[in-house]
Each structure stands twice: as structure tokens, then as C-alpha cells.
Amino acid sequence: MSISSSSSSSSSSSSCLLLISLMLLAASCQGRPDLQHRNHKSQLAGLFGAEVAALLEDAGAADGSSGEEAALSQRAPPSIRALHPRSGRLGLRDDLEAEPPAENKPRRRLLKDFMSSRKMFRGRTKKMQQGRGCFGMKLDRIGSMSGLGC
């Protein structure tokens, strides 16, 4: 009997030791902020230009941006701040007041159309798409849609 009780006590002590070591390991591996991704907006502005940075900031302003985004816009590179020295940030209202160069107009318009079209299709549901006939639509075996008529 003493052999079985000693083996059970050693297994319980080893499980306690394992549990304590796991807790210490978890405490040492706490999450730390990634310093490389801290100013991602300035990196995007550097890669894709001022148009994308302006669209990102305007989308944040439309969604009710926080003070953190305002702080990020203050840390923008000097080339972006030079575009609008009075405010230090880019915005659609400022862009509409100041005419962009003719070469940037088509690109800016395409980006603006893409961003607004995404909002237009946001609320469509399955019920809204099925209202095409009195009795609905039918998918045939060959993959074509046919109305069931009135």
C-alpha cells in the first residue's frame, strides 16, 4: 500500500509542479505592443500617397474618430502636413476647397466612388433580393434562374 500512495503523491506533486511552471511561463509571455505597427497611417501615406491617407482619415471622421486617430494625424510626415499647414490633417472638405492637380483627379474620383459604393450595398438582405415575382424565383438544374410567375 505504501508503494501506491507514494506513486500517487509523486504524481500529484509532479502535476502541481507542472501547473506552477505553466503559470510562470504564461506570466513571462505577456503581450507587448508592437512598435512597428504603431504609426501605420504614416506608413500607408508613404506607400500609397496622400490620397489614400486622406480617404482613411475621412472614413475615420465619418465613423466618429477617437482622439487616438487625431494624435496619429499629428505624427504624420512633414510632406503630408505641408499639404494643409493650417490644420495638420487631410480631409474631404479641405480637398474640395483646394483643387487637386489635373493628373490626380481621375484617381481621386475612382477612390471616392469605390468608398461610397461600399456604403450603398451594405444594407441589402436576402428578402430584398427575392422580390422579383409573385411566387419567387427558381434555380433550374442547369443553373439558370426562372421566375415562377404571377
Swiss-Prot record:
Give the protein's recorded name: C-type natriuretic peptide
Supply the InterPro entries for this chain.
Answer: Natr_peptide (IPR000663), Natr_peptide_CS (IPR030480)
The residues the entry assigns to the signal sequence are 1-31
Q: Does the keyword Signal apply?
A: yes
Its subcellular locations are:
Secreted
- Source domain of life: Eukaryota
Q: Which PANTHER family match?
A: C-TYPE NATRIURETIC PEPTIDE (PTHR12167:SF2)
Q: Region (Disordered): which ranges? A: 60-109
One MF term in GO for this entry?
hormone activity
Where, by residue number, does the polypeptide cross the bilayer? Answer: none
Cellular component annotations (GO), alphabetically ordered: extracellular region
The protein's organism comes out as Acipenser transmontanus
Of which family is this protein a member? Answer: Belongs to the natriuretic peptide family.
Which cysteines share a disulfide bond?
134-150
A Pfam family annotated for this chain is: ANP
